[in-house]
Amino acid sequence: MRIGHGFDAHRFGSTGKLILGGVEIPHEQGLIAHSDGDVVIHALCDALLGGAALGDIGRHFPDTSAEFKNADSQKLLHRVMVLLKEHGFKVSNGDMTIIAQIPKLAPYLPAMRETLALALGLPLQRFNIKATTTERMGYIGRAEGIAAHAVVLLLEEQ
């Protein structure tokens, strides 16, 4: 068994869509990023890669590469899952926390949970996602951006 932890944060400022956990969230601003800015999936990818000792998302999908400009993060997650399988790992379970002052995310968490559990090949009872605020403290509390943490347990396939 191996544990992986991932973190990502992006600031608001894009005129594009706000996508979190593969779900489009109605909001007047998107997140500034080289890809689609999905901090939830980026944190999850880092947790998966870290648990398997395969580096991080920046190593596999560098923001200096035109190939990943405006990339759909769900496709990046799929590529990470292929890498895990190639290296003999499967996901046992996962837990995520999104940290955002705005927008309110509770109505979208079930769709994110379903989307990500499916992408990881997990039943819903083995994947959790929740959201919190920073009670108006720091850059997130000032509504300057969104962050996410992910923890996963990986099993080595025999």
Curated annotation (Swiss-Prot):
Catalytic activity: 4-CDP-2-C-methyl-D-erythritol 2-phosphate = 2-C-methyl-D-erythritol 2,4-cyclic diphosphate + CMP
Note on how the cofactor is bound: Binds 1 divalent metal cation per subunit.
Region forming the signal peptide: none
Subunit-level organization: Homotrimer.
Family listed: Belongs to the IspF family.
Site residues (Transition state stabilizer), renumbered to this chain: H34, T133
The EC number(s) this enzyme carries: 4.6.1.12
CDD domains in the cross-refs: MECDP_synthase
Sites where the protein binds a divalent metal cation: D8, H10, H42
Protein name: 2-C-methyl-D-erythritol 2,4-cyclodiphosphate synthase
HAMAP family listed in its UniProt record: IspF (MF_00107)
Function recorded in the entry: Involved in the biosynthesis of isopentenyl diphosphate (IPP) and dimethylallyl diphosphate (DMAPP), two major building blocks of isoprenoid compounds. Catalyzes the conversion of 4-diphosphocytidyl-2-C-methyl-D-erythritol 2-phosphate (CDP-ME2P) to 2-C-methyl-D-erythritol 2,4-cyclodiphosphate (ME-CPP) with a corresponding release of cytidine 5-monophosphate (CMP).
GO BP field: isopentenyl diphosphate biosynthetic process, methylerythritol 4-phosphate pathway; terpenoid biosynthetic process
GO molecular function: 2-C-methyl-D-erythritol 2,4-cyclodiphosphate synthase activity; metal ion binding
Co-factor requirement: a divalent metal cation
Residues involved in 4-CDP-2-C-methyl-D-erythritol 2-phosphate binding: D8, A9, H10, H34, S35, D56, I57, G58, T132, T133, T134, E135, R142
Keywords recorded for this protein, A-Z: Isoprene biosynthesis, Lyase, Metal-binding
Listed pathway(s): Isoprenoid biosynthesis; isopentenyl diphosphate biosynthesis via DXP pathway; isopentenyl diphosphate from 1-deoxy-D-xylulose 5-phosphate: step 4/6
Pfam families, sorted: YgbB
